[in-house]
Amino acid sequence: MDFQTIQVMPWEYVLASQSLNNYQENHVRWSQSPDSHTFSVDLPGLRKEEIKVEIEDSIYLIIRTEATPMSPPDQPLKTFKRKFRLPESIDMIGISAGYEDGVLTVIVPKRIMTRRLIDPSDVPESLQLLARAA
């Protein structure tokens, strides 16, 4: 059986080339507090209209850039897209985003879980019998 030799491309050299990688990589910073998750990304030089924040299937947060008709035709398009899986315990209605001084900040609030104490005298007699039987 003959095996063909596969030539491996030196990707680290090609991708590190300045001509192919004109823009610095945008890193998304994530932090968590007791009340929310916060995503921050530096997107300098963009207008608010060029940034899209979307929720897909109530599971994923997508942050991306999109060229608009007002974008100067002589400028190369800068594209950015990141997709994050959201935890189940978030408040979908309370998600907010803001873009100021070239920094996009998306705040995803956590759903407030409250525990309710049940007074045994409030439990109907039929449920008390079921609890004892179990």
From Swiss-Prot:
Q: What is the scientific name of the source organism?
A: Arabidopsis thaliana (Mouse-ear cress)
Q: Which GO terms describe its cellular component?
A: cytoplasm
Q: Where in the cell is it found?
A: Cytoplasm
- Write one Pfam family the protein is assigned to: HSP20
Family statement: Belongs to the small heat shock protein (HSP20) family.
The protein here is known as: 15.4 kDa class V heat shock protein
Primary place of residence? cytoplasm
User: Which InterPro entries has this protein been placed in?
Assistant: A-crystallin/Hsp20_dom, HSP20-like_chaperone, Small_HSP
| Subunit and partners | May form oligomeric structures.
Q: Which UniProt keywords apply?
A: Cytoplasm, Stress response
Ranges for domain sHSP come to: 19-126
